[in-house]
Amino acid sequence: MSREEYFLDKFDEGLIEPSMLVRMTQLWQETHGLEADGYFGPMTAASFNPPSSTVMHPFGLSVLMAAISDLGKGEEGGNNSGEYVESILGKEFDGDNDNDGSWCAAAVSHWILEASKSNNVTIEFSTSFGAKALYRNILAVGTEVSEPAAGDIVCWDRGAVGSWQGHIGVVERYESGFLHTIEGNKGSYPSKVRRFRYDLSRESRLEGFARFTDSSVSGSNA
C-alpha cells in the first residue's frame, strides 16, 4: 500500500478528520510565509512543488538560515532602538530609547557575518549599514539575477529616485510571481525581523537581486 492510499484509507475510516487537515495546512502555511488560513489554494499547492531549476549558492542559503534564526528580533523601547538593534549596529547596549539609526542593512550584514563564521569562510566584500552600498558590494563579487532564489539579496530604491536611500533583505523563495523575503526595519515601531510577501508585478522600485558566487567567499568550506 502506498502512503497516499494509506492516508485515503485513514480518512475513510474517520481517523483523520477534516479539522486535522485544516490545522496541518495552517502549520505548513505558517512555516512557508503564507497566510495561515487553512485553505489549500493555488499558492499553498505551489509551495509543495517549488521550482528546482535555479542553482542556489550554499553561502546564500547559510545567510538565509541566519536570517530565519533572527525572526522576531528587533526594536524595543523606541524606534530603531533596543539591544538587538544596537548590537547589529556595532553599539554597546545603553538602555536608552534613542534612535540609533536605520538597521535593515545592518541586519543583512549581521546575517552575512554569521554565515561566514558558521561556514569558516572569509567574505570577499565589505558589509555596510547602507542598503544600496551593501547591495553594490555583494554584486561586485556576485552576480545579478532576474529570477531570484533562496539566499539571494534583494534591494529596493527609497526616497527620491536614484538617491542613496534604499532598503534590503534576503530572499526566502520565489514562486508563482510572488517574492517571499525576510527583512528587518520595515514598518512602524516596533519593527521586527519578519517575513514579507510581494507580487513582483507591482514592485516598481526594485534595484535588483544579487546572488552570491564562489568569488563572494574564500576559505576551507567555500
Where are these regions (language model features)?
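Short acidic, glycine/serine/threonine-rich helix-capping segments at coil-helix boundaries
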Residues: 1-50
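Extracytoplasmic/periplasmic, Sec-exported soluble proteins
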Residues: 13-21, 40, 55-59, 96-104, ...
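Terminal peptide-recognition signature
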Residues: 25, 108, 151
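Surface-exposed patches in mature extracellular/periplasmic domains of secreted proteins
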Residues: 36-40, 74-85, 119-128
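N-terminal capping segments
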Residues: 45-117, 221
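...with weaker cross-activation on analogous glycine-rich loops/strands in unrelated enzymes
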Residues: 58-61, 118-189
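Catalytic alpha/beta core of large soluble enzyme barrels
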Residues: 187-197
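Low-complexity, Gly/Ser/Thr/Pro-rich intrinsically disordered linker/tail segments
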Residues: 200-222
